Regions:
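Bacterial N-terminal signal peptides that target proteins for export
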Residues: 1-8
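Sequence-level preference for short, compositionally simple segments enriched
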Residues: 21-337
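Bacterial N-terminal signal peptides
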Residues: 8-18
Length: 337
């Protein structure tokens, strides 16, 4: 034991000065972590231009370049042009904001549709798919240019806390798909057009000061609200207009039995049928769907002629339709009105 003790002691003595001069990487091997390199700077603003004058030529390239799971807003400025893309904002690309210069000159377009050669269906035909939370779009057009060929979605939104301002959604059947339960979506000063069920889905969505334009005789809203949801589609201070080909249009019909759709202070054109609502060929839906109006105006406003299973809200009932209440959920969210 004495031999071993002096052996180790002798070995340690000459090593002491060396230890004092050990570099950081060597020290890490002794339990001291090396200093981490500084993270690369986070790019919070990018520009897309089809002529190559921006950071990227396509919107998808810019989205792909944004930081994953960002906790701050990443703004992508989009120059005027027609962008022929099947754009996806995946779930890990959070807090992305797309800003165009003018919705009429900044257009994202596609033409996929149910039954096309690629085998698309309603759930894959969209031109733009938003899966990420905290997404915002301003001054953009989302278009499905397939024409009247069946289901052809322009914009499909799954993510929570999605906001669209001064945007246009162009298409025919199934133009706008606020898709899933638990998703809260806000549309302000937007233009939305279509033919059959052109605003449809399960999400909770509010439409403020939007123009809702029917292109032919059919149905506007096809909510699929679940019985767990207190709110479905809420239209506030909107204008319901129509092409000359549309003169018999329903406010909505229930895609699922517990559909909820409410119009508050909306101006209804003459194309809206006096009955107002359709039961989708199932009388049982009349007992479960919630369809209501408050202070509708215009030639399409006919409260006395509405189907008996719909409702005309009182002033007190209408007060419940605030953004704070509608978007309450498990986490608070109140977009700027």
């Amino acid at each position: 034991m004495r031999f071993r003790y002096f052996f180790w002691a002798g070995a340690l003595l000459p090593l002491a000065p060396a230890l004092a001069q050990t570099s950081a990487p060597a020290a890490a091997g002794l339990g001291m972590p090396p200093a981490r390199p500084a993270p690369p700077p986070q790019v919070l603003r990018m520009t897309v231009a089809p002529d190559g004058s921006g950071d990227y030529r396509t919107i998808q390239e810019a989205v792909n370049a944004s930081r994953d799971l960002s906790q701050v807003t990443v703004t992508i400025l989009i120059k005027p042009g027609t962008y022929r893309e099947k754009l996806v904002v995946p779930a890990h690309k959070t807090h992305v904001t797309l800003v165009g210069e003018d919705a009429r000159t900044t257009i994202i377009t596609g033409a996929d549709h149910t039954g096309d050669a690629a085998g698309h269906n309603t759930y894959s035909s969209q031109t733009v798919l938003v899966q990420a939370t905290d997404f915002t779009a301003e001054n953009l057009t989302f278009e499905n240019a397939a024409g009247p060929v069946g289901q052809a979605v322009a914009l499909h939104v799954d993510g929570d806390r999605a906001t669209f301002r001064r945007c246009r959604m162009l298409g025919n059947q199934d133009t706008l798909f606020p898709a899933v339960e638990g998703s809260r979506q806000y549309y302000q000063d937007c233009y939305i057009e279509g033919t059959t069920d052109f605003i449809f889905g399960t999400a909770t969505a509010v439409f403020d000061r939007c123009e809702i334009r029917s292109k032919r005789n059919s149905y506007i809203a096809a909510a699929a609200t679940t019985e767990r949801q207190a709110y479905g589609f809420v239209f506030r201070d909107c204008r319901l207009t129509a092409d000359t080909a549309a003169h018999k249009v329903f406010l909505g019909r229930p895609w699922r039995p517990h559909a909820r759709t409410v119009y508050l202070r909306c101006e209804l054109g003459a194309h809206i049928l006096p009955a107002g609502w359709d039961n989708w060929r199932d009388a049982a839906n009349e007992r479960t769907a919630t369809y209501a109006e408050y202070k509708s105006t215009g030639p399409g406003a006919a409260p006395a002629a509405r189907v008996p299973w719909s409702h005309q809200l009182s002033a007190q009932e209408a007060k419940r339709y605030t953004l704070a209440r509608i978007f309450g959920g498990t986490t608070t969210w109140q977009p700027l009105e």
